[in-house]
Each structure stands twice: as structure tokens, then as C-alpha cells.
Amino acid sequence: MQTTTRDKTIDFIKGILILFVILGHTTLGLTDMYSFDDTMYGIANVIYSFHMPCFIAVSGFLYSEYVGNASQGIFSRIGHKAFNILLPYVMISVIYWIIKFALSNLIREPVAVSSLISIPWKPIEFLWYLYALFLIYCVAYMADYVFARLLPHFNYKMELLFVLFLIIAFTCYGSFHYVGFNYIAGFQMYFYLGCLIKKWLDKLDNRYAVLSLAVMSVLVEASSIVLQDDMSSNPLFSSLFERFTACIVTVFIFAVSYFLSGYCDFPKWLQTIGRDSMPFYAMNVIFVGGIRIILNRAGITNMALQCICGFAGSTAICWILYECIIKKNRFIDFIFYPCKQIYIRK
């Protein structure tokens, strides 16, 4: 039986990104209640500009390890991802809808029955990510299939696909009636960015070269910020700048993380959050909203305090539930990781 060694640096990156997701959900919930100053609004915008693209890049980074060695057929691979991603998507969506429906008197935006029925083609709120990720994998599998038959010896497939979907992102994103096509148009490029990062890091044996890549990313991004003020009124430039920011920050996070991995050990708790990120991703919205409601009813309206309590409190609650209940209960763990439980039974 072949065993694989987990990449602790990837777990660390995912752990950092989950914390950004929780912080992003905390700030997003406050935007409708308070007037953000420029600093807080800027923080929220920066978080939302890169944290989900970077998550998708992680999937591309890991996917590239198996490209060219796909022993399964395309339909078998898609079926496996449907079981591993779509099944949790449906189960979590139903549970989340039931919770929101039960608490409809306490929340600002109660859910309707139509939102539950439309899960197959219109995700509920933050669960768009799982829906989009499955479609992104499907496109990647189909692209592999086409290249394997038409251009089996072409060595720049990832570069070509990245450029292709970068163009699609600028020209087609938001123009489709079906939201799934918009997810593909807007985020497939980040998947292939992750594939390219894997390719680059494999070629950069010297860790100082990796650090120089990170420094270069920061310098390029800084020069772009200088130009933004003069060109921000141009919609095309705004889109270009947003995607460029996401790409640069993603490269920076990967480069710095892999550079640091050669000199220090990452915190175990952060690696744990990254390794089992699904429960934290799925649960944090509920607890962020719950803490916000409790603080409001207690008369605590200070925005900074709301942010701190929402972020720290929801992270702590998710961690406690994960340690005490989720990882010890096979049925609950199945909701988040169905394939893992199937393998355990075997």
C-alpha cells in the first residue's frame, strides 16, 4: 500500500487562509451595521481580494502532483470529486439552511424555501466555494483529457491554460446566466496559478531564490498601488488590478511559507486547522453571526470589539467543537470528509 507524506507547509498556508476567511466573514457581517473608516474598509477589501483565490491556488498546487499520472478515467475522477466535494456541499447546505430557518427571527436575512430547492444551481452564501471548486476540477479533468489526446508531449500546458483563463476572466466573467460558468470564468485561472507555483517552486532549489521571488512580488504590487489612484476609474484596469493583486499575494504567501519552512517549525495548531480546514470553513459563519447577535443584544456596539470577539470567539468555538466532537464522531466527520470515512471502513 502506497503512503503519502503530508506537506506541512501547505497545511500551514491553509491554516493561515482559514483565519483570513473567519476574519473576512467577521468584517463582512459588520459592514451592514456600521460605517467603516477607510482603514477598516481597506482591510476587508484586501482580505476578500486574495483569500479565496489563494485557496483555489492551493487546490491547483496539489492537483499538479497528479497531472500526467491519472490512472483513472475522466468520469471516474469526476465521480470521485462529486463524492468528496458535492456531497459535503449538499449536506452542509441543508444543515446551514435549517439553522438559518430556525433562527429566522434573529437574523437580518431569513432564508426562503426556494433557496434550499435551488442548491443544485445556486449555492447558499459562502458555500459557493465548494460548488465552484467542483466545477473547476471538472474543467481541469476535461482539459487534461483533451491535451492527453491532442498534445500529449506539450510541456507548457499549465502556462497556456493560465493565460487562456486569464483572458476569459477579463472578457466573460459575470456575463453568464448560470452562476457556475461565472465561477469557472472568474476563478479557474487561480487553479492554474497554483499549478504554476508548484512548477516554479520545484525549479527553485535555493531557498533564497524563493525569498527573492516573494520580495519581487511585493515590489511589483507596490508599483501597481502607485498607479491605481490614477487609473481606478477604468473598469478594465480595476479588474486587472484586482486579479493582479490576488495573484501577487498568492505567490507571496507560497514563496514566504516555503522559505520559512526550511528554518522553523510551523505552529501545530495552525497546521491542524489547515489539515482539517473544512469544519472550520463550514462552521465559522454560524458562530460569527451568533456572537454578533449576542453582542448587539448586550448593547456592545464598538466595532473593534465586535471584530475581535467575532474573530477570536468563532475560531475558539470551532476549535473546541472540532477537538471534542467532530474528529471523534464518524457520522459528523463523514459530513465533512466522506471519502476519509469510506477508507477507514475499508
Give the predicted meaning of each segment.
Residues V58-S76, Y178-I184, L240-I248, S257, ...:
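Cytoplasmic juxtamembrane interface segments
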Residues R275-G289:
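Hydrophobic alpha-helical membrane segments
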Residues M1-L166, C264, T272, R297-K346:
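Membrane-cytosol interface segments of multi-pass membrane proteins
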Residues M40-M52, I117-A132, C172-Y190, S224-F252:
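Interfacial loop-to-helix transition and helix-capping segments at the boundaries
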Residues I184, L204-Q271, I286, T301:
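Alpha-helical transmembrane segments and terminal signal-anchor/GPI-anchor hydrophobic tails
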Residues G29-Y34, A102, L106, F170-H177, ...:
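Juxtamembrane "helix-exit" motif on the non-cytosolic side of transmembrane helices
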Residues S59-Y63, L135, V139-A143, M189-L201, ...:
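Transmembrane alpha-helical segments
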Residues P120, A143-F237:
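Aromatic-enriched alpha-helical transmembrane segments of multi-pass intramembrane proteins
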